[in-house]
C-alpha cells in the first residue's frame, strides 16, 4: 500500500480553502490521487543529480546581455494613440474597474 501523506479531512479542508466544490463521492479518489502524486514527487526528490553539471542547464534564462537598451521614441502622438482606444477621459485611457 502507498504511504499516506494526506487524509480525507485534509482534502476536504483544502477544497474548502480553495473555494472548490468537492462531492463526497470524489473525496477518496482525490486522497488516493494526491498521495500518489506526493509519493512520485518523493521519488523525484530522491534522484541523485550530483553528477549533473548544473551550470549547463541555466543558459535558457534571459540575462542582461539578452536585453536591448530602452530607447525613448515618439512614434505616436497622444492624439493618434487615443484615437485607437474605446474610451478616453482627460487625455488618458479609461479602463474597466477591476476591483469593486
From Swiss-Prot:
The keyword ATP-binding applies. It is an enzyme of class 6 (ligase). GO terms for biological process: regulation of translational fidelity; translation. Its EC number is 6.3.5.-. It comes from the Bacteria. It catalyses: L-glutamyl-tRNA(Gln) + L-glutamine + ATP + H2O = L-glutaminyl-tRNA(Gln) + L-glutamate + ADP + phosphate + H(+); L-aspartyl-tRNA(Asn) + L-glutamine + ATP + H2O = L-asparaginyl-tRNA(Asn) + L-glutamate + ADP + phosphate + 2 H(+). The keyword Manganese does not apply. Keywords: ATP-binding, Ligase, Nucleotide-binding, Protein biosynthesis. It holds the Pfam family GatC. GO terms for molecular function: asparaginyl-tRNA synthase (glutamine-hydrolyzing) activity; ATP binding; glutaminyl-tRNA synthase (glutamine-hydrolyzing) activity. InterPro entries: Asp/Glu-ADT_sf_sub_c, GatC. Heterotrimer of A, B and C subunits. Allows the formation of correctly charged Asn-tRNA(Asn) or Gln-tRNA(Gln) through the transamidation of misacylated Asp-tRNA(Asn) or Glu-tRNA(Gln) in organisms which lack either or both of asparaginyl-tRNA or glutaminyl-tRNA synthetases. The reaction takes place in the presence of glutamine and ATP through an activated phospho-Asp-tRNA(Asn) or phospho-Glu-tRNA(Gln). Belongs to the GatC family. This is Glutamyl-tRNA(Gln) amidotransferase subunit C. The lineage of its organism: Bacteria, Pseudomonadati, Chlamydiota, Chlamydiia, Chlamydiales.
Amino acid at each position: 500500500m502507498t504511504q499516506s501523506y494526506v487524509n480525507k479531512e485534509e482534502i476536504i479542508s483544502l477544497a474548502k480553502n480553495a473555494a472548490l466544490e468537492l462531492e463526497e463521492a470524489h473525496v477518496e479518489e482525490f486522497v488516493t490521487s494526491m498521495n500518489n502524486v506526493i509519493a512520485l514527487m518523493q521519488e523525484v526528490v530522491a534522484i541523485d543529480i550530483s553528477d549533473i553539471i548544473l551550470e549547463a542547464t541555466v543558459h535558457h534564462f534571459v540575462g542582461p546581455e539578452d536585453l536591448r537598451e530602452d530607447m525613448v521614441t515618439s512614434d505616436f502622438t497622444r492624439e493618434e494613440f487615443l484615437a485607437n482606444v474605446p474610451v478616453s477621459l482627460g487625455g488618458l485611457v479609461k479602463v474597466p474597474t477591476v476591483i469593486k
